């Protein structure tokens, strides 16, 4: 009798645990679906971006309008999803805190995912570039080994900061590339790691002859749109739009407009 009651108790317990597991699973799916449903209902995709990182996300000097490669790509994605992109400009080192706090649904700001895979969801890649090291024009820094012990001006939460640390540099925290280059010219930093496309654009548009690209560093860098964990259905729709843009040539067209070549591959 006792054995029969014990067996019955165990069967009921297992059934209850299974029900709880199913409930949690459907709740997780509901959470994903709720975010997409909420975004779709509002008709707005809220986007976190710097607005100071030319040519990816910055303000046009004449119109003061927010523009750039990342801005145009996410605007086109939103358009294809029947949404309007609403940009919330945020300093880079506060970007992921803002995403976590639900100030925006997605980050469009040349985000690398190395070291962040467990904390965030990511879209498919939409840019491939290289990291470069920038120094003063007369600097003797010419290779990775020369970086050790030197001062690198870096945004503390960027992947470029990680590259500088791995090379043995001392880190001087900054808010973005513009401040990094300023510190180099002032002699307060020796170098900075940053995106090759951004640096080439800066050298081309600024006319600044006081700094140079010393060398390329690390492996090619891919960039992605970043989302909070559990944004699955929204990520799926964004990836669908990106896939369409790659297939019909729109993404390549936007890339060539900004860089003269297709950097989306």
Predicted regions: what is each one?
Residues 16-19:
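C-terminal motif of bacterial Sec signal peptides marking the signal peptidase cleavage site
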Residues 21-23, 71-80, 158, 222-262:
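Extended ligand-binding regions for polar small-molecule ligands
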Residues 28-109:
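Extracytoplasmic small-molecule ligand-binding "clamshell" domains
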Residues 43-49, 144-157:
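Short loop->beta-strand "edge-of-pocket" segments that line small-molecule binding or catalytic clefts
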Residues 51, 128-135, 196, 200-243, ...:
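Periplasmic-binding protein-like
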Residues 71-72, 86-97, 157, 172-186, ...:
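Short helix-initiation/N-cap motifs at beta->coil->alpha
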Residues 79, 84-146:
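Acidic, polar ligand-binding/catalytic clefts
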Residues 82-84, 100-109, 186-198, 209:
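Alpha-to-beta junction loops
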């Amino acid at each position: 009798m006792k054995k029969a009651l014990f067996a019955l108790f165990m069967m009921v317990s297992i059934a209850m645990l299974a029900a709880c597991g199913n409930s949690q699973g459907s709740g997780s799916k509901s959470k994903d679906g709720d975010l997409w449903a909420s975004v779709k209902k509002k008709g707005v995709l809220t986007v976190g971006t710097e607005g100071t990182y030319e040519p990816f996300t910055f303000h046009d000097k004449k119109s003061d309008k927010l523009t750039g490669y990342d801005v145009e790509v996410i605007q086109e994605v939103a358009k294809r999803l029947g949404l309007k992109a609403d940009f919330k400009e945020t300093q880079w080192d506060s970007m992921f805190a803002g995403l976590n706090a639900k100030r925006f649904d997605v980050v469009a700001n040349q985000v690398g995912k190395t070291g962040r895979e467990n904390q965030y969801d990511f879209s498919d890649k939409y840019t491939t570039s290289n990291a470069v090291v920038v120094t003063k024009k007369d600097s003797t820094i010419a290779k990775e080994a020369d970086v050790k012990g030197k001062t690198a001006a870096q945004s503390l939460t960027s992947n470029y900061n990680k590259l500088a640390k791995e090379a043995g540099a001392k880190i001087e925290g900054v808010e973005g590339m513009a401040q990094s280059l300023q510190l180099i010219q002032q002699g307060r930093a020796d170098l900075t790691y940053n995106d090759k496309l951004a640096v080439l654009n800066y050298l081309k548009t600024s006319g600044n002859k006081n700094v140079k690209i010393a060398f390329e560093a690390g492996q090619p860098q891919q960039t992605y749109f970043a989302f909070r964990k559990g944004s699955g259905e929204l990520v799926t729709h964004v990836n669908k739009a990106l896939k369409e843009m790659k297939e019909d040539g729109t993404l390549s067209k936007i890339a060539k407009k900004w860089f003269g070549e297709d950097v989306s591959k």
